[in-house]
Each structure stands twice: as structure tokens, then as C-alpha cells.
Amino acid sequence: MKFFLDTANVEEIKKYAELGLVDGVTTNPTLVAKEGRDFYEVVKEICEIVEGPVSAEVISTDAEGMVKEARELAKLADNIVIKIPMTKDGMKAVKILSAEGIKTNVTLVFSPLQALVAAKAGATYVSPFVGRLDDIGHVGMKLIEDVVKIYKNYDIKTEVIVASVRHPWHVLEAAKIGADIATMPPAVMDKLFNHPLTDIGLERFLKDWDEYLKSRK
């Protein structure tokens, strides 16, 4: 399974890219706004750091506006992917962009039927949101399970990006289910390294080694 980093912070992306963990990046207007920089400038810089797909979201809500923005964004780099909201106008834009060879990531997906519609429109990626479903009492990972099963049933090539990831458990379950990608904030990616027994074991090894050195004196 691929790991995407869900952030527009260039320093965070560099840090995890150096560890070989960043297969791609997803951004949205909120994340870019936090950086206080020009939108296009930030996206272009991220594309230069990461070889994999970099998702940048359109602001327009009508199909014509989305397509216009998408074409401009696509000029920034070859690895740009256009994030399009799961709406009727969004699917119209996806169909047009797909025909032009521009990759798309359909976002704000909350049901298997939405994921199926996005795939039929020609989406390269689809982003079901698990955390937000958990927030309202649903089981977010059940959505991922259903989407993966449907895509497998019909040999659909659209890749599933598990989004709205809140903790490492989401990443683990996504991998077990067979999702293609999990996109996560830096705080979650950082926790993938951790286990209390690892810390205890390392501390014990170091203590034993220190005692061994003392015994050799």
C-alpha cells in the first residue's frame, strides 16, 4: 500500500520524503491557506520534492470553472492530480478532464455509490473519508471495504485513497482491506514508527551493552 502525506507544509514533506515514506501528497485549500503563501507556488514546490502524485483542489463549484482551473494547475507539473468534489458538476468536469488525459482525484466521497459514480466518470483516484464518518457514528472503514470490493468485482482501475485518516488504526485497517493508498497528516505518519515494546527493548539493549562495557574495564 502507498502512503500519501496530507499536508501543504513543505518542510514536513521533505522530512518524511527523506525516510522514503512519501509516495504522494494530497492538499486542499484549507491546508494551503495555513501556509500563508501563493497557492500555485506551494503546489509547484511540492511537485518538485515528490515524484509521485500531488493532488491540488479546485475552488470552483461549476463544471466550466473546475475544468478551467484544472487545466491551469495541470501546467505546473506532470505529477499534478486535480481534486474534484463529488457533485454532478464535479463528475461532468472529471469526464472532460479524463478525456484530455488530466488525472483526477474525486474527494468528499462518503458512500460506495458515490465511489462507483466517480469511477464511471473516469476518476483516476477516489477519496472516501473515514474519520468524518466515524465522527457521526458510522464505521468509516466499512465504506473502504465496500468500495474496494465493488472495484474488484468489476475490475475498476480507479485507485482508492483512504482519506480523513485520524490515527494509525485507520492505516492498518486500510492495508488489511486492500486499499491502494492511505493519505495521512504528518502527526499520524509519525505515530507509525511507535510501539512501547520497541522503546523498552531498545532501552534494555542499551543498558545491557553499557553493563557489558563496564565489565570489560
From Swiss-Prot:
Pfam families: TAL_FSA (PF00923). HAMAP family: Transaldolase_3b. Transaldolase is important for the balance of metabolites in the pentose-phosphate pathway. It is an enzyme of class 2 (transferase). One of its GO terms (biological process) is pentose-phosphate shunt. One of its GO terms (cellular component) is cytoplasm. This is Probable transaldolase. The active site is at residue 83. It comes from the Archaea. Belongs to the transaldolase family. Type 3B subfamily. Pathway: Carbohydrate degradation; pentose phosphate pathway; D-glyceraldehyde 3-phosphate and beta-D-fructose 6-phosphate from D-ribose 5-phosphate and D-xylulose 5-phosphate (non-oxidative stage): step 2/3. Its main location: cytoplasm. Keywords: Cytoplasm, Pentose shunt, Schiff base, Transferase. CDD domains: Transaldolase_FSA. Disulfide bonds: none annotated.
